[in-house]
Amino acid sequence: MIFDKYTLKKTQLRNRIVMAPMTRNMSPGGVPTQDVINYYERRARANVGLIITEGIEISHDASSAYPNVPRLDSDASIDAWKTLVNGIKINDGAVIGQLWHCGGFRKPGMGPNPEVPGHTASGLTRPGKNVAHAMSINDINETIDAYAEDARICEKIGFDGIEIHGAHGYLIDNFLWEGTNQREDAYGGSIEKRAKFASEIIKAVRAKVSKDFIVGFRFSQWKQ
């Protein structure tokens, strides 16, 4: 069964082998290098049916926390992603881009916007550790818009879909987890309220892309 073809929405997969996202830290300035492009092409040539890329930091000032992580906020990065996606497609692979906001993992002085602090639901990076910025409603709305716009760009580039990274203690998971979400507004309290941020991101993304564009959501109880 693992080698059988599979159809996901309108995306034809040659088999059911899926490569999970793995951070590479090989994209200086947010631009995937030729080595990164070659890395993904080799996996497609080796008959991986569906590749989920490493995390792509969304185009938001506070999204980054690690060096040399790819982005979508420049012509150079978009051109590199086009080359990368085309390299997978010509080798009969399918590709989903993982969209990522690192939230409270962002350290003071981290580029590309060193003056911007890490963002979290209520200032907590873990229970009892208050070292980050508690997001305002405006911050939340800007972040939702950034996810949706980058999903639109991914579809325009040629990705088959996107995966929203909602796991491992990063921003969305920080809202989901009651240990770090101590908000007293519409985004905190019950599990339904803590999930509101994630739900609004998914809805905003879905509204910006076509009905056959794959939209996935990654979640996990494991924390980074």
Segments and roles (model prediction):
Residues 1-102, 143, 151:
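N-terminal capping/small domains of soluble enzymes
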Residues 100-159:
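Non-globular sequence segments
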